């Protein structure tokens, strides 16, 4: 059933966002802040955000970059096993989650975790359980690139079983194995990107290489995308939208050693609307996927924002301040007509 020609999404949230720092932060922050009410901000800067002072300082830089936009940056900390209870208690009110990266698996993750020894991780993860701090995880091994996420599912299961009170967010899932894990443990949740709902590996490398679709985790097989679509379109109660929008300068993408990341922030809501309509999923499911589930899972109350979408063709700009978005130069079905503060 087609969506109305115009309709309103209430308080959209992006539960996995890269805003970078410095000039890049100032160039792209408003692309998210103008249409989302808030976002979970990734901590993998150089150096990574790993102290209370760094969290506060980075949040201040984000707030400066977004200006007067009605947008809440929900901050995260880069996980280290050395964090103790006193340290975490001191910054509990400054963060929404802590992000765990396997060492060297993605951009600026060299200081991440190696080995996943449960006993080594126990003090920090038990403290997080007690303090109700969610653990967000980039779930990939260092194995063959197409198998990395599926191989990591066993680590998710070990963590979920060892720390049953710990809320574990499987970030940007891309495989049917990760989808299946959702219902095996009550403390496993997930985010899904918009680009992984649209593309498979064929779109990235089946013809001419498409550097602006290259990301980590890499896009997978059609059957994996189908598994993602099923839980996203149904707004599975443990699944949230998280763009993993990851800007890089054009020269870092269109080069040998192409940087991993797809920039979707300016068009994420339009693409999701197009997707849900194409699959006859009701607007209520879209609303839950882009806001309701996240508010419940994270127990947050963001500032209200209303985004009015219109069924009118929109040509995606070639770039946003030097960053090339997904589908640059192509026409998509929906335009954002108006954004206003909600009631």
How would you name each of these model-derived features?
Residues 3-4, 87-100, 108-241:
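Histidine/acidic residue-rich metal-binding segments in metalloenzymes
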Residues 10-22, 135-141, 192, 245:
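Histidine-centered catalytic micro-motifs
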Residues 14-15, 27-54, 67-80, 96-108, ...:
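Divalent metal-dependent hydrolysis catalytic cores, especially in the metallo-beta-lactamase
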Residues 21-24, 79-83, 172-176:
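Short beta->alpha connector loops
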Residues 73, 92, 147-165, 183-194, ...:
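Short, electropositive alpha-helical surface patch
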Residues 192-259, 307-340:
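Active-site neighborhoods of metal-dependent hydrolases
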Residues 234-301:
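His/Asp/Glu-enriched, well-ordered alpha-helical/loop segment
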């Amino acid at each position: 059933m087609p969506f109305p020609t115009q309709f309103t999404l209430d308080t959209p949230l992006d539960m996995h966002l890269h805003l970078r720092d410095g000039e890049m932060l100032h160039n792209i922050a408003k692309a998210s802040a103008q249409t989302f009410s808030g976002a979970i901000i990734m901590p993998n800067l150089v150096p990574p955000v790993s102290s209370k002072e760094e969290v506060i300082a980075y949040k201040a830089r984000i707030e400066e970059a977004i200006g007067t936009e009605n947008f809440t940056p929900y901050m995260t900390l880069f996980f280290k096993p050395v964090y103790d209870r006193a340290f975490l208690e001191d910054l509990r009110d400054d963060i929404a989650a802590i992000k765990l990266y396997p060492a060297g698996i993605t951009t600026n993750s060299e200081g991440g975790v190696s080995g996943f020894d449960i006993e080594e991780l126990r003090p920090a993860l038990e403290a997080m359980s007690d303090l109700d701090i969610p653990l967000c995880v980039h779930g990939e091994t260092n194995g063959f690139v197409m198998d990395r996420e599926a191989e990591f599912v066993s680590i998710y299961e070990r963590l979920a079983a060892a720390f049953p009170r710990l809320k574990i967010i499987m970030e940007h899932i891309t495989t049917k194995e990760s989808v299946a894990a959702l219902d095996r443990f009550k403390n496993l949740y997930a985010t899904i990107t918009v680009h992984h709902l649209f593309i498979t590996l064929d779109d990235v490398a089946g013809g001419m290489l498409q550097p602006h679709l290259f990301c980590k985790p890499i896009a997978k097989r059609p059957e994996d995308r189908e598994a993602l679509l099923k839980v996203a379109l149904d707004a599975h109660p443990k699944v949230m939208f998280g763009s993993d929008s990851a800007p890089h300068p054009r020269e870092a993408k269109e080069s040998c050693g192409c940087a991993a990341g797809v920039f979707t922030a300016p068009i994420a809501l339009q693409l999701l609307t197009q997707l849900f309509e194409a699959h006859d999923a009701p607007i209520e499911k879209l609303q839950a996927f882009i806001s309701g589930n996240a508010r419940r899972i994270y127990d947050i109350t963001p500032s209200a924002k209303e985004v009015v979408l219109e069924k009118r063709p929109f040509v995606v700009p070639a770039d946003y301040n030097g960053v090339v978005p997904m589908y640059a130069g192509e026409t998509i079905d929906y335009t954002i007509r108006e954004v206003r503060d909600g009631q």
